[in-house]
């Protein structure tokens, strides 16, 4: 089911939560809403669900005006961060709850629960209670319960926010695979930019109640529309173009390191090193002044991402290896000018 948000605004007292927002979500897509706290993303999600009323504007579901439609008429499944499972019901009964309320055929209920347990890979835990499950397992049950009634739209509000980092990574992959098997139109709110980049087909970036940019993960990361998006969606390094008297940004993976200076290279000293399974992160202090702005602090610290292979190659070429205090020369492979900003 498609979703069309048309000129939606919402105010709480004197706080403008949403300011004339327009957004189209295509049927079957997987969309992430990201932005700082208070930017309006959760408010919009609740409006789509029918939990909040707009001050102005319209919400269209599958081409029909649903602005004032009651929750039960919207055919929407909603999953919150805190699971909201019934503690006194086992896994199977939690999943079947919505179907039983609708007085579905008992055979259909059993079949649907069986299919969903298989889908979330918890067939062996059908008789367990929520207290006997891990956080990740409880969240999968919550998703299955939302899917049991075959919603046209699935809304997820910080679905993995209460889980530890390892479980979140596992569930990101699981959610992506789940959506491929059951391509229900899905909109989820997250504070984790990396989660949005890994899971979503399309990302919507909010800031102060307005949309800053809508696009694919690649578009958002490589071609940010505004300085805010640039700084919010991943780490950025800043440089100054003395010829054009403007500022530019470089992503950490678009920096080349060298052992000797070359044209347009910048010298710097390694002040931090972070080891990863497949990559290395270097923090290099470059003696240049970058003007401060509302989207980035003043500073000269560049972060550089290298594959372990490239790092090992450079490490073998430098006497004593790359270590804290080593002097390197860096050069941007690709830069983006900061639109609307100059020094």
Swiss-Prot record:
Part of the ABC transporter complex involved in sulfate/thiosulfate import. Responsible for energy coupling to the transport system. It is an enzyme of class 7 (translocase). Its EC number is 7.3.2.3. Keywords: ATP-binding, Chloroplast, Nucleotide-binding, Plastid, Sulfate transport, Translocase, Transport. Belongs to the ABC transporter superfamily. Sulfate/tungstate importer (TC 3.A.1.6) family. InterPro entries: AAA+_ATPase, ABC_SmlMolc_Importer, ABC_transporter-like_ATP-bd, ABC_transporter-like_CS, P-loop_NTPase, Sulph_transpt1. It comes from Nephroselmis olivacea. It is found in: Plastid, Chloroplast. One of its GO terms (cellular component) is chloroplast. This is Sulfate/thiosulfate import ATP-binding protein CysA. The keyword Plastid applies. It catalyses: sulfate(out) + ATP + H2O = sulfate(in) + ADP + phosphate + H(+); thiosulfate(out) + ATP + H2O = thiosulfate(in) + ADP + phosphate + H(+). ATP binds at residues 35-42. SMART domains: AAA. Residues 3-233 form the ABC transporter domain. GO terms for molecular function: ABC-type sulfate transporter activity; ABC-type thiosulfate transporter activity; ATP binding; ATP hydrolysis activity.
């Amino acid at each position: 089911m498609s979703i069309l948000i048309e000129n939606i605004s919402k105010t709480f007292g004197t706080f403008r939560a949403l300011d004339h927002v327009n957004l189209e979500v295509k049927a079957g897509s997987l969309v992430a809403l990201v932005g700082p706290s208070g930017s309006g993303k959760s408010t919009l999600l609740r409006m789509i669900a029918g939990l909040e009323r707009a001050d102005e504007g319209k919400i269209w579901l599958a081409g029909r005006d649903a602005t004032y439609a009651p929750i039960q008429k919207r055919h929407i499944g909603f999953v919150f961060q805190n699971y909201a499972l019934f503690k006194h019901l086992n896994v199977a009964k939690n999943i079947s709850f919505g179907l039983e309320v609708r007085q579905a055929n008992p055979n259909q209920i059993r079949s649907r629960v069986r299919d969903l347990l298989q889908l979330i890979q918890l067939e062996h835990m059908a008789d367990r209670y929520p207290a006997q499950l891990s956080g990740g397992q409880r969240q999968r049950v919550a998703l299955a319960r939302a899917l049991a009634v075959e919603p046209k739209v699935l809304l997820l509000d910080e679905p993995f926010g209460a889980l530890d980092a390892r479980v979140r990574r596992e569930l990101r992959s699981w959610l992506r695979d789940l959506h491929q098997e059951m391509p229900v139109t899905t909109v989820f709110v997250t504070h984790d930019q990396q989660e949005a980049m890994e899971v979503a087909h399309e990302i919507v970036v909010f800031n102060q109640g307005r949309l800053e940019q809508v696009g694919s993960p690649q578009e958002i990361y490589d071609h940010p529309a505004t300085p805010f998006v640039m700084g919010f969606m991943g780490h950025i390094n800043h440089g100054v173009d003395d010829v054009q008297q403007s500022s530019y940004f470089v992503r950490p993976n678009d920096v080349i390191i060298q052992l000797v200076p070359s044209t347009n290279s910048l010298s710097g000293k390694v002040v931090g090193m972070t080891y990863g399974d497949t990559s290395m992160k270097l923090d290099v202090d470059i003696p240049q002044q970058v003007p401060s702005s509302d989207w980035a602090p003043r500073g000269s610290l560049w972060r550089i991402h290298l594959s372990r292979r490239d790092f090992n190659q450079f490490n073998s070429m430098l006497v004593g290896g790359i270590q804290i205090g080593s002097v390197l020369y860096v050069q941007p492979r690709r830069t983006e000018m900061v639109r609307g900003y100059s020094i």
